[in-house]
């Protein structure tokens, strides 16, 4: 039994885990390659309005650091999951985000908040350069709507606005069209505007180029 477990099963299991983790790592590398990586980001704040999953901020920082690549001075992921969300800009430095399913995608596995620590309407979180106030929470204490106030105008060049989504892309080897995690720069809404995630992506030149490339004949 010891030989079966340690000589036969364990090495094969380790090989399988390495392949799985390697594949996942390559996918994340490709996704994070669409986030800014030149030296100019070192004094910038990267704001991801929505990321496809809860692990973006953690793995992005970990992988960039491991590869000795430039990191933004601050990274703020405001919501995760591919859920409908509206973004209202009532003032120069303020956003109101409203969701249908909350700000956290994988609630059971979330690295952001444990379900044992529910949030309340009116709860305030302040971090460098930004304050978030929960304006609506569900019965389980998960935030649904929130106001984000920054310490400078949202139009300031030091703030980089991005959205993560599952974008269409053709496999370069097979020509097959896939949905892959990618990040796109988006213009921040104008004061007085209320837009959806799809509205903002539709204003992104890079997103439009990616969609057009995926739709082009192979």
What are these model-derived regions, one by one?
Residues 155-195:
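Short, cationic low-complexity segments
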Residues 216-218:
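Short, solvent-exposed mixed-charge patches
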Residues 52-61, 101-111, 132-133, 153-160:
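Short, surface-exposed beta-strand/loop "edge" segments at domain boundaries and coil↔beta transitions
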Residues 123-133:
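Short coil-to-beta-strand transition motifs
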Residues 66-114:
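Luminal/periplasmic acceptor-recognition loop/helix of membrane-associated glycosyltransferases
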Residues 2-79, 184-189, 194-200, 204-208, ...:
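Membrane-embedded, lumen/periplasm-facing catalytic core of multi-pass transferases
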Residues 138-151:
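Short, solvent-exposed secondary-structure boundary/capping segments
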């Amino acid at each position: 039994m010891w030989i079966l477990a340690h000589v036969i099963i364990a090495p094969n299991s380790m090989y399988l885990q390495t392949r799985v983790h390697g594949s996942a790592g390559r996918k994340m590398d490709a996704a994070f390659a669409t986030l800014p990586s030149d030296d100019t980001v070192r004094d910038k704040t990267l704001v991801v309005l929505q990321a496809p999953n809860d692990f973006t901020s953690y793995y992005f920082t970990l992988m960039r650091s491991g590869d000795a690549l430039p990191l933004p001075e601050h990274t703020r992921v405001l919501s995760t999951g591919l859920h409908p969300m509206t973004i209202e800009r009532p003032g120069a430095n303020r956003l109101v985000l409203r969701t249908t399913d909350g700000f956290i995608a994988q609630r059971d596995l979330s690295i952001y908040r444990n379900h044992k620590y529910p949030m309340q309407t009116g709860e305030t979180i302040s971090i460098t350069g930004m304050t978030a106030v929960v304006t609506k929470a569900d019965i389980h204490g998960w935030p649904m709507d929130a106001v984000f106030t920054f310490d400078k105008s949202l139009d300031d060049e030091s703030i980089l606005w991005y959205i993560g989504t599952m974008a269409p892309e053709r496999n370069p080897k097979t020509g097959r069209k896939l949905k892959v995690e990618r990040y796109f720069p988006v213009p921040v809404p104008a004061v007085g505007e209320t837009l959806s995630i799809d509205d903002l992506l539709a204003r992104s030149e890079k997103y439009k180029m990616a969609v057009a490339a995926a739709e082009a004949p192979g």
